[in-house]
């Protein structure tokens, strides 16, 4: 297999996890162990630009969005601990806090996030190139630690611009729909309550209640109750039509009708009571219908009530 494709078979795709990069690849690198397949190359970070890594760190023939390499940490000062990450065109700047990488048992390393800036520090132009730098957890009694790190470089997807384009299209559609409603709707500026409310009632007009008609059917047990209610039927309908109430007073202009007590059962629906108000006295008299009293006496004898 030629070295142009990284020595991997066709269709090979390299997507290691953080734990695999630290526990397998970087640990073997600092221990000088041999890899069965050389897929991660050594790169001098100070001598290569991020856009040149696409050709230098290519693995196989399949398209890649991430590029991996080993790099030896270069001290910015001989006696200091700061790492030099400057290139010819710019520099890598650390951002945020380092993330601790753990396996199922313990802490195995750290991950540092860096962003590439064009120009010279402290003034530089931020780019979309991001790098994750992995290092083994520093220990004083580890003789194999040789300053090696493994890096993953990728270009940040510009989802924000795409989202803005989509959002702008949606907002434009909403604005067009709103303008169409303003042009076409005859109910602009009218609330839902005003659209659905009934016609306004004047001060001196009282709403007429609907005609109350008895909906129950008389019990067919040998006695026809409709004959007994015939004399009261016309009087029942007339009583349910008030002629009006004077505004500002509590006096009824005319006589109100019969209070229908059909809330309990069918056998009580035929019972009624009549209230009369002479317009001057505040007390009302109750007159039970004579026909119903006679019916109650007969039905009581039959055991119906």
UniProtKB/Swiss-Prot annotation:
One of its GO terms (molecular function) is sequence-specific DNA binding. Residues 8-156 form the NAC domain. Its main location: nucleus. Residues 108-162 bind DNA. It is found in: Nucleus. SUPFAM superfamilies: NAC domain. It holds the Pfam family NAM. Coiled coil: none annotated. It comes from the Eukaryota. Expressed in the root cap, in both columella (COL) and COL-adjoining lateral root cap (LRC) cells. Also present at low levels expression in the tips of cotyledons and the cotyledon vasculature, as weel as in vasculature of the first pair of true leaves and at the hydathodes. The keyword Iron does not apply. Keywords: Activator, Developmental protein, DNA-binding, Nucleus, Transcription, Transcription regulation. GO terms for biological process: plant-type secondary cell wall biogenesis; positive regulation of DNA-templated transcription; positive regulation of gene expression; root cap development. One of its GO terms (cellular component) is nucleus. The NAC domain includes a DNA-binding domain and a dimerization domain. Transcription activator. Together with SMB and BRN2, regulates cellular maturation of root cap. Promotes the expression of genes involved in secondary cell walls (SCW) biosynthesis. This is Protein BEARSKIN1. It comes from Arabidopsis thaliana (Mouse-ear cress). The gene is BRN1.
């Amino acid at each position: 297999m030629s070295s142009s494709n990284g020595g991997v078979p066709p269709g090979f795709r390299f997507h290691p996890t953080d734990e695999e990069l630290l526990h397998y690849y970087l640990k073997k690198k600092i221990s000088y162990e041999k890899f069965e397949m050389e897929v991660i190359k050594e790169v001098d970070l100070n001598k290569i630009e991020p856009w040149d890594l696409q050709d230098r760190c290519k693995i196989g023939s399949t398209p890649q969005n991430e590029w991996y390499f080993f790099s030896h940490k270069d001290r910015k000062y001989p006696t200091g601990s700061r790492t030099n990450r400057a290139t010819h065109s710019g520099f890598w700047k650390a951002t945020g806090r380092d993330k601790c990488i753990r396996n199922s048992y313990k802490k195995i390393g750290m991950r540092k996030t860096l962003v590439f800036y064009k120009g010279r520090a402290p003034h530089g132009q931020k780019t979309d190139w991001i790098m994750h730098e992995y290092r083994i957890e520093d220990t004083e009694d580890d003789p194999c630690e040789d300053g090696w790190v493994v890096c993953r470089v990728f270009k940040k997807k510009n989802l924000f611009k795409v989202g803005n384009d989509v959002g702008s299209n949606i907002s434009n559609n909403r604005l067009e729909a709103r303008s169409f409603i303003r042009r076409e709707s005859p109910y602009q500026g009218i609330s839902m309550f005003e659209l659905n409310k009934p016609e306004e009632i004047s001060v001196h007009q009282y709403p007429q209640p609907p005609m109350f008609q008895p909906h129950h059917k008389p019990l067919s047990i040998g006695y026809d109750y409709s004959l007994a209610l015939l004399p009261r039927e016309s009087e029942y309908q007339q009583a349910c039509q008030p002629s009006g109430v004077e505004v500002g007073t509590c006096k009824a202009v005319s006589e109100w009708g019969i209070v229908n007590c059909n809330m309990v059962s069918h056998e009580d629906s035929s019972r009624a009571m009549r209230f009369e108000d002479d317009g001057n006295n505040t007390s009302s008299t109750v007159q039970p219908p004579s026909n119903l009293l006679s019916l109650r006496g007969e039905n009581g004898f039959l055991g119906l009530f």
